[in-house]
């Protein structure tokens, strides 16, 4: 059922909590799960990795013990975990959950949230042998050179990509090598989301920008005190592909450079803080322009009142 302003008013099948990094999403999700018998489900592309508890700001072991948490820290850093992988895991988890359990999806990755409701393009899996061959050929080449190579093989994809966007250029090259088709040719075929058509409460947590920037900077310093450098040192020892998501997480490149001796510790911290602030800005922009009007922009304090109101409503009303 909807209110006169078009918002759902009945009890939701799931709660979706998004927002910029350091906005209080995890704390709100845990509070909801404890109060209403819910399970907190990770919806953040970095918090899936076992290697990054500290740098991804994953819930602590103590917090995870207060309510069920799923899809956190379950993936090895060597895996190129995609939105398709997330959607399949989330769908499987939802099918296994008891009927009375409230799913509480928490995170900052917009495409993950979109995959739950609107679905995603049905992109094919790229065999490891092809991915490794393409990346070996690309090693040491400027991204602009790779973009030019893509333009020769797949002009349609190249036209829609910035010549400096190495990750997406590489993805287009891999898809074309594996299928002989443009990556854009797969966009019309969609995999429906596991929450499509269900009543949902979608909350985007917002806060005053300067306060958020200060929290981001302070949190990165705290991460350093909690072992962020040890996490990066362990990743560095594994010599993983620098294009893997885990190697591009905020803080990893700068701290790797510090361990390599090319920048100072203070410069590494400043780089991590700056990268995270810019990411938060992109999160605001992306959700504002890419997600539907059914997302409620709210403060963490006001969000709790909205949750209480919706969860106290009888189902179907």
Swiss-Prot record:
<dbReference type="GO" id="GO:0006400">
    <property type="term" value="P:tRNA modification"/>
</dbReference>
<feature type="binding site">
    <location>
        <begin position="21"/>
        <end position="26"/>
    </location>
    <ligand>
        <name>substrate</name>
    </ligand>
</feature>
<protein>
    <recommendedName>
        <fullName>tRNA dimethylallyltransferase</fullName>
        <ecNumber>2.5.1.75</ecNumber>
    </recommendedName>
</protein>
<comment type="function">
    <text>Catalyzes the transfer of a dimethylallyl group onto the adenine at position 37 in tRNAs that read codons beginning with uridine, leading to the formation of N6-(dimethylallyl)adenosine (i(6)A).</text>
</comment>
<keyword id="KW-0547">Nucleotide-binding</keyword>
<feature type="site" description="Interaction with substrate tRNA">
    <location>
        <position position="109"/>
    </location>
</feature>
<dbReference type="InterPro" id="IPR018022">
    <property type="entry name" value="IPT"/>
</dbReference>
<dbReference type="InterPro" id="IPR027417">
    <property type="entry name" value="P-loop_NTPase"/>
</dbReference>
<comment type="subunit">
    <text>Monomer.</text>
</comment>
<comment type="similarity">
    <text>Belongs to the IPP transferase family.</text>
</comment>
<feature type="binding site">
    <location>
        <begin position="19"/>
        <end position="26"/>
    </location>
    <ligand>
        <name>ATP</name>
    </ligand>
</feature>
<keyword id="KW-0067">ATP-binding</keyword>
<feature type="site" description="Interaction with substrate tRNA">
    <location>
        <position position="131"/>
    </location>
</feature>
<keyword id="KW-0819">tRNA processing</keyword>
<feature type="region of interest" description="Interaction with substrate tRNA">
    <location>
        <begin position="44"/>
        <end position="47"/>
    </location>
</feature>
<dbReference type="Pfam" id="PF01715">
    <property type="entry name" value="IPPT"/>
</dbReference>
<keyword id="KW-0808">Transferase</keyword>
<dbReference type="GO" id="GO:0005524">
    <property type="term" value="F:ATP binding"/>
</dbReference>
<dbReference type="GO" id="GO:0052381">
    <property type="term" value="F:tRNA dimethylallyltransferase activity"/>
</dbReference>
<dbReference type="InterPro" id="IPR039657">
    <property type="entry name" value="Dimethylallyltransferase"/>
</dbReference>
<keyword id="KW-0460">Magnesium</keyword>
């Amino acid at each position: 059922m909807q209110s006169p302003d078009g918002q759902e008013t009945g009890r939701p099948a799931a709660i979706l909590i998004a927002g910029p990094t350091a906005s209080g999403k995890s704390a709100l999700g845990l509070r909801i799960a404890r109060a209403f018998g819910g399970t907190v489900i990770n919806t953040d592309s970095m918090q899936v990795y076992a290697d990054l508890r500290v740098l991804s700001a994953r819930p602590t072991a103590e917090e995870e013990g207060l309510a069920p948490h799923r899809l956190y820290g379950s993936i090895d850093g060597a895996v190129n975990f995609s939105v398709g992988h997330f959607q399949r895991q989330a769908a499987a988890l939802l099918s296994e959950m008891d009927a009375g359990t409230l799913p509480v999806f928490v995170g900052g990755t917009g495409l993950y949230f979109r995959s739950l409701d609107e679905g995603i393009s049905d992109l094919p899996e790229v065999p490891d042998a092809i991915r490794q061959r393409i990346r070996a050929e690309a090693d040491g080449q400027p991204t602009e050179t790779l973009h030019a190579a893509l333009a020769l093989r797949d002009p349609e994809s190249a036209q829609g990509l910035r010549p400096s966007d190495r990750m997406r250029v590489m993805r287009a090259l891999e898809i074309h090598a594996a299928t002989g088709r443009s990556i854009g040719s797969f966009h019309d075929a969609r995999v429906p989301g596991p929450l499509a058509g269900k009543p949902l409460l979608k909350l985007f947590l917002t806060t005053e920008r300067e306060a958020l920037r200060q929290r981001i900077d302070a949190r990165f310093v705290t991460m350093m005190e909690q072992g962020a450098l040890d996490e990066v040192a362990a990743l560095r020892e594994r010599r993983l592909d620098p294009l893997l998501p885990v190697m591009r997480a905020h803080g990893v490149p700068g701290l790797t450079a510090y361990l390599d001796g090319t920048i100072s510790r203070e410069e590494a911290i400043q780089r991590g803080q700056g990268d995270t602030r810019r990411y938060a800005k992109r999160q605001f922009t992306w959700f504002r322009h890419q997600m539907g009007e059914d997302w409620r922009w709210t403060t963490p304090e006001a969000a709790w009142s909205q949750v209480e109101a919706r969860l106290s409503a009888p189902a179907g009303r």
